[in-house]
Amino acid sequence: MKKIVIIGANSFQNPLILKAKEMGYETHVFAWKDGSIGERTADYFYPISIVEKEAILEECRRIQPDAVTTIASDLANITVQYLAEQLGLPHNSDNCIYISTNKFAMREAFSKHGVPTPGFVSVCEGDDYAAAVADMQFPMIVKPTD
C-alpha cells in the first residue's frame, strides 16, 4: 500500500485525509493534537507541530512515504517542501514556496504576470508610512508579509 504524509489535521486538511484514504493511501498525519479532527480520521496520527521539521523528518524516514503534501496552509507548505526535498520526493522549488508564503512577493508575481491584484506596498519599520500609502484609497487592509 502506498503511504502519504499529510501535514496538518484541521478541518481544512481533513477532506484531503479522507480523499487519500478513499484512493487507497495509508495516511500518516502530523499536527498539534488540540483541534485536530484528522487525529480521528487518519490511519496514523503524530502529535508533532507542523513547524518541527526535523522531528517530522525523523518519522518520515521510518515511514518511507511515497508522497508528502498539505492543503490550505501556507505554513505547512514550507514543511512539505523541506520534507519532500530531504526525502527525494517531488516538491515545489524554494522560490515557489517563498512567493506563495510571502504576501508582498506573491502580489509582485501576480502583477508581473498580469494577474489582477489590489494595490499594495511594502512598509518596514522606520519607513514613512504616510508617504508609502499616500496614493492608496480607503478602505485599506494592512497585513504582515508572512
Language-model segments: which ranges?
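ATP-binding N-terminal substructure of ATP-dependent carboxylate-amine bond-forming enzymes
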Residues: 1-96, 127-130
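Active-site nucleotide/adenylate-binding loops and adjacent lid/helix of ATP-dependent enzymes
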Residues: 102-146
